[in-house]
Amino acid sequence: MAVYTEVSDDELEDFAAEYDIGQVVSCKGIAEGVENTNYLLQTDQGNYILTLYEKRVNPEELPFFLGLMEHLAAHGLACPTPIHGRDGKALRTLCGRPAAIVSFLKGMWSRRITLGHCAELGPAMATMHLAGADFPLTRANNLSVAGWRPLFESIRPRAAEIKSDLAQSIEDELDYLEAHWPRTLPVGLIHADLFPDNVFFLADKAAGVDRMSGFIDFYFACTDVLAYDIAICLNAWCFEEDGAFNATKARLMLNGYRRVRPLSADELDALPLLARGAAMRFLLTRSYDWLHTPPGAMVKRKDPMEYYRKLRFHQGVTGPGQYGIE
């Protein structure tokens, strides 16, 4: 989440008046994330999230995202749900951009990922995959293997600003991924951006542990290889700050997932390749954002080199056992 578009008090009041959510008390920008403009909206009836859709979000795909959140919530997955206005619409326009208000999900994301967090993540991700099985809409993953080379070409001229030989490294890896990408693995609804800041936890004080309270930010959700979601999480959840891979975290996440949705031998064997692809996807998008984020935007740029180093790790993985598979 981020803030690219400032909303005036008058514009906000007029927009909120379309909903039965009470009187606006405050509206505070949320700086985390990189895709859309987000505000924490407080009214005299409660808290909400106001989102203005920017950049890579195609307005024609917004009914997919909003409908998906409603579908998953109806199937028992904890996630925000769109608030419908008095006219029944969940999507309207604010400051010239598509905009929506969604419910506020209690909890916080953890800045320090523990073994317990990974153990909670696995079964919840599998539950989401199963819940999405009968969602009637589909959406292609525009940031999967077919989209990586065009994205690379858009950063190639300036890639050396990040690392002198980055362009050649990416080109070599893309050649490999395009030649070997799996085409026959189980496909379904995936989140595709299940980073720690999109997973909320609440403290269970009695048990002395954190319990997952839900998933947020479904605006990259799509129809793709289910195990690719797992590969994204191997990258996002299982590396330590010093860059070391934590196989115990990976094992707990994978074991929890497999208890809810067993993985086939083909899916397990494909994990190293899928993890390389996931690292490439975020290396490319982070590189693009690093080079193209507007000056003065209220957004935190994320270091693309983190994913270059993760890619290098996965290139050295020879089998799923190195991810803690038992």
Swiss-Prot record:
Gene3D superfamilies reported for this sequence: 3.90.1200.10, Phosphorylase Kinase, domain 1
InterPro entries, sorted: Aminoglycoside_PTrfase, Homoserine_kinase_II, Kinase-like_dom_sf, Pseudomonas-type_ThrB
Catalytic activity: L-homoserine + ATP = O-phospho-L-homoserine + ADP + H(+)
Cited Pfam families: APH (PF01636)
Pathway(s) it belongs to: Amino-acid biosynthesis; L-threonine biosynthesis; L-threonine from L-aspartate: step 4/5
EC number(s) reported in the record: 2.7.1.39
Entry keywords, A to Z: Amino-acid biosynthesis, ATP-binding, Kinase, Nucleotide-binding, Threonine biosynthesis, Transferase
GO MF, one annotated term: homoserine kinase activity
Coiled-coil annotated residue ranges, if any: none
Source species, domain of life: Bacteria
Gene Ontology biological-process annotations: threonine biosynthetic process
Family named by the database record: Belongs to the pseudomonas-type ThrB family.
Protein name: Homoserine kinase
Gene from which this protein is expressed: thrB
